[in-house]
Amino acid sequence: AAMLEQKKVTLEIAGIPMPSFVKLMLKQSINEHHYFEITLDIQAVEIYGVEIPNVSKDWIGKKVIMDFGGTIFIGIATMVGLHRAGGTHGNIKVTGYSSTFLLESDHTCASWCNKSLSDIVKELTDKAGVQALVNPETKSKLEYECQYEETNFGFIQRLARQYQEWLYYDGQNLVFGKPQPGSTTKLIYGEELSVLDVCSQALARPIKGSSYHSVNDQTYNGQSPDAAAG
């Protein structure tokens, strides 16, 4: 049987290259944050001058860069812990999310009038310092759009669902809208793919909504498109 292609993986945390790691797990989903777990050997980390008692303070909130044979993933460390068992010197466990996690603000309320989807999403990503490629199929300006008791990322997720736009993280950028066309990549089950599922799904009916703007005594109506773009 054919074997999955092996890629050289390198790792950097808070600007420090890690010589090795015990375990690395990266879970990627469309429309969601990506999640990772890294287990490091304490002795290997100490070689690079990392002070173990201060590792939590020094690493939490810092950038984590993974290089999978030229494919880059950039994330943020959100938890660092020390694990010891069986009398061993122990391991350091680092968990975190894609840089999109910076959009997890407090639940807030905001509104926009006569702004496009691009304007709204770019405003939020720029404010959070998240690199984004914003190119929605919906180009027209929206009469009225509001964010109500949602995090910034939750609001962007809702906009993607409401207007049936792509939303995913490509390892370095949050992509909102139709991705740029690229070259065709051939994937073979048993080589590049270890699991393959094929299915069909019935979608909900288009979303309709309306809101009243008391300042100018106007009612605004909106509807999601009937068909997904892309």
Label the model's feature ranges:
Residues 1-230:
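Amphipathic alpha-helical and helix-coil boundary elements used as assembly
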